[in-house]
Amino acid sequence: MRLLPIIGGLCWCCLLALGQAESGSVAGSIFDSAHAPAAGISVEARNLETRTDYKAVSSAKGEYTLVQLPPGKYDIFVINPKYGPFVRRGIVITAAQPAHLDIQLSSNTALTTLGEMPELRELLSKKPPPPQGPAPRVADGKPDFSGVWLISPSSLGGSSQQPDLLPWARAIYRERVLNSYKDKPSARCLPELAGFLARWPIRIVQTPKLLVALRSDDVISAHQVYLDGRSFPKDLEPSWQGYSIGKWEGDTLVIDTRGLNDKTWLNMFPHTAKLHITERLRRPDLGHLEVETTYDDPESFKTPFQTKIVNVLSPDEEVEEYVCAENNQYSQHVSTN
């Protein structure tokens, strides 16, 4: 009678071995942005047919192995707050041959993917150095931010903190990465968040009571900042660009923006209508405009986080009209489901 449990155990082991023999694996090493082995990094594989996810964690030496993968095509990805997202699509897994994939992680530029915009890189490479001299001032002695501005080459890599996302926001961000950002609002001619990141030329017009930023890369081409000492309306209706009030702290203009809706993307990150943006603008000299931005949304981020960029004065540039319906060639590839 003792043979029955033994035989049963042998049969189970045989079935388990057979299942492992019919599955595949992928292994490799993970390196951080300094090219050193990255330990404790979660790497995942998504079966493109079943949409099933498989997970492994890298060892102290940065090595990982994803096992028991049914044969088929997979997306292999790492989405970690410390690094930029890594996605390798369409990896073929077979039972006969283990796959190998080393993963090189990049530094996280958080709110800017500008380094991946070849058109912008080409434009900036042809720009002459910004003009030199002291920052101009208006009649009351405050710095004058007026002019046409474009992001500096030194800011292409970004100087930004990574938002520490709450679980619901992290899950949405993860899916946006895996879906190649196909539902990004701008792909449907919807507005982006206002701000002074000059990916393409922006013109700032400054008066004693109002500052206006004119853009050439968004559906809403003008963003108003009130400088007349007003307070926020009591019943602030959420809108695409929110409501912005500016106050001076010495030579720094502090812009407080509230009343944003939750429809825009903060680069690729989700946010709620609780999002509060604080921008600090400084013009240390004639040719440079420093922009430090703090994002606070307690319903999306565990703590506030900052970005820092520098724009350069570009008097040879113009802010041209932007007609999204004519320019948006990507929309035909976006799912309408």
Q: Model-flagged regions — what are they?
A:
Residues 41-43:
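Short beta-strand elements bearing conserved aromatic residues within extracellular beta-rich modules
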Residues 5-17:
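Bacterial N-terminal signal peptides
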Residues 45-47:
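Conserved aromatic beta-strand anchor motif in extracellular beta-sandwich/beta-rich domains
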Residues 1-2:
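N-terminal secretory signal peptides that target proteins for export/translocation
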Residues 13-15, 25, 137:
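Generic alpha-helical structural signal
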Residues 20-22, 29, 33-36, 52-54, ...:
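PEST-like low-complexity, intrinsically disordered acidic/proline/serine-rich tracts
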